[in-house]
Amino acid sequence: MSSPPPRPISVVELDLAGPDGPVLSLRPVPGGPALRAGAVYALVRVEGRPAATVLGTVADGEDPAEVLGALARAQLAETGPRTDAERLAAVRPIGRTDLPARAREGLTPPRTSVVVATRERPEQLARALDSLLVQDHSDVEIVVVDNAPRTTDTHDLVTRKYGDRVRYVREDTPGLAVAHNAGAAAAEGEVLAFTDDDVIADPHWLTALTQPFAADPGLGCVTGLILPARLATPAQILLESHGGFAKGFEPRLYDPAEPPADEPLFPFTAGSFGSGANMAFRAAALRQAGGFDPATGTGTAARGGDDLYAFVAVLSAGFRLRYTAEALVWHHHRDTWQDLRNQAYGYGAGLTAYLTATLVRHPRLLPALLTRLPRGLAHARAMTARRGETPEGGVPGEHGTHHHPWPRSLSRLERRGMLYGPIGYAKARAQAAQRKGAGR
């Protein structure tokens, strides 16, 4: 007998005065509904700094701050560096950016351009832009790339509601990587930040994402934390139950000159570095790495892999990559089961499409990639199989006490996507060559 679908989970923010201190505040996430009795997923902040997530149950009549505060203190007592990348970040911190937000001074974030690629989603885009326009970063421009539009809705929104506060760029060739390259070409910032039209950015997001560039001239990329804005449907809960987009709360530093010994597949485990909804590049480093591969990404036959390709390209060019949980965006996961099926297939396709792109565009990496490829594919296959077969565990994001098993059908879709990825990439390259030959 199948288990009943999960009930909606409230999503809130809980701020503590210290790891074992009292609760300073408890509030819904930006744009979210009020907390109600039942399951609650909480981002735990310590003096404003994202530090953990907890999943608990608040019964009628209970004080939610008391219940969640106790869970948070227990969770924080168990945190600390566990991987080589986390240990490297701990011994090479970014000065004052590792302090709580209210204590930071002295590091001025560089001039930054935020690029948001979008296609026919004006309501979501407006929500994202509203959050970007209240960032505490003092020197920023926002560039919207309207990718292969069918209507004028995006153009009308940007020009009428936002005027000269947001720049509008039209890119008629479909594909997320193409759109990102168009935005990068139009942007004026020393740092290029990228996010999606289905996020709400924390007010400190851009400062936290870009301050590290001011302290480390060898830094080519910074990625940040992505948490769910809503957990209202079974598909949203299932995705977050198995990791979602979050990469944890410990800072991590990846240095090609000091590859992590506990990641033998480095740098080809690009999925562990971050996600495209929350990433920034030093503009010069991204240009040196050749930009995004236009045959990758949503909107192409490759289905994905544009962000993963860029991470590896920048690392392969000799630049460092840093992950910081202080750069936070809230992501609106897709609502439906079919969305989740499409996402699972796209993940698999994007993984092998980006590996194929790396081989094609950086042939000098061929020996290293071939050495690691069998183990990497076996690891990916084992991970998808394990998700489908694990009977119990912690969720969402591995921080709770309830489990919603990952259906084997989704694991099979991921593996089918992995088989398709190289074919999709080849198709996308052929289509790009055809457009170029036709003068488009």
Task: Describe each model-derived feature in a short phrase.
Residues 204-247:
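Conserved donor NDP-sugar-binding/catalytic core segment of glycosyltransferases
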Residues 2-5, 9, 14-21, 29-37, ...:
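N-proximal low-complexity "stem/linker" segments adjacent to membrane-targeting elements
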Residues 130-170:
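Acidic donor-binding segment of Leloir-type glycosyltransferases
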Residues 154, 171-187:
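Glycine-rich, basic loop-to-helix element that forms the pyrophosphate-binding segment
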Residues 346, 363-440:
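Non-catalytic, C-terminal membrane-associated alpha-helical segments of glycosyltransferases
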Residues 242-271:
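Short, flexible, basic/aromatic active-site loop/helix in glycosyltransferases
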Residues 274-277, 298-310:
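Acidic donor-binding loop at a coil-to-helix junction in glycosyltransferase catalytic cores
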Residues 192:
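Short aromatic/hydrophobic "clamp" motif used to bind/position activated sugar donors
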